[in-house]
């Protein structure tokens, strides 16, 4: 059965290594008959969560802040799969991705009577470091998030050894891994 997939691309670089992972994933997912909507967060005006817990009262506009999250909320609600994509910054996801994901709280946990639907999820991660230790903090964050939301982890692609934009283009195995994950979802 075809799935609706939302990708939150948290790379601040428009043409960085994370973007290449996303393109490979999308190629695989679409070849398997899925529909994919990519949100390039660096191009969007998204404010940080205020922690006000005032959202969730209006399904059409679940957050009190009015910014580009209004484009993401409906796609998120309808998605079967949510893919988080980010470069590693200080052993975590980018600020762009964290900011957007924090704002999903208005939908995932504040809507009266809204049961956060069980979704599938995946993580695409590019980084300069290439050891398992480098990815451990991000893995803990991602697995904790998936567990809290009762999401099924469909896979993680760690693409280490990539610093300069385009480095990953010299590592076809990493791009193939992202494409394969897209195909299998």
PLM features: residue spans?
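N-terminal beta1-alpha1-beta2 submodule of the flavodoxin-like/Rossmannoid cofactor-binding fold
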Residues: 1-107, 165-185
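A short, flexible beta-alpha/helix-coil linker loop
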Residues: 127-130, 160-164
């Amino acid at each position: 059965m075809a799935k609706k997939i939302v990708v939150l691309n948290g790379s601040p670089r428009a043409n960085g290594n994370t973007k290449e992972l996303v393109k490979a994933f999308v190629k695989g997912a679409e070849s398997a008959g899925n529909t994919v909507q990519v949100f390039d967060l660096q191009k969007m005006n998204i404010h940080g969560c205020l922690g006000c817990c005032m959202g969730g009262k209006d399904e059409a506009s679940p957050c009190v802040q009015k910014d580009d999250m209004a484009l993401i909320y409906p796609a998120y609600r309808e998605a079967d799969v949510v893919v988080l994509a980010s470069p590693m910054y200080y052993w975590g996801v980018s600020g762009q991705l964290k900011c957007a994901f924090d704002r999903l709280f208005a939908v995932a946990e504040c809507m009266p009577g809204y049961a956060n639907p069980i979704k599938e999820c995946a993580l695409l991660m590019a980084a300069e470091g290439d050891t398992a230790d480098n990815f451990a903090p991000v893995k803990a964050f991602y697995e904790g998030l998936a567990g809290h939301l009762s999401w099924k982890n469909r896979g993680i692609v760690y693409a280490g050894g990539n610093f300069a934009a385009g480095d990953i283009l010299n590592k076809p195995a990493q791009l193939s891994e992202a494409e394969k994950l897209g195909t299998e979802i």
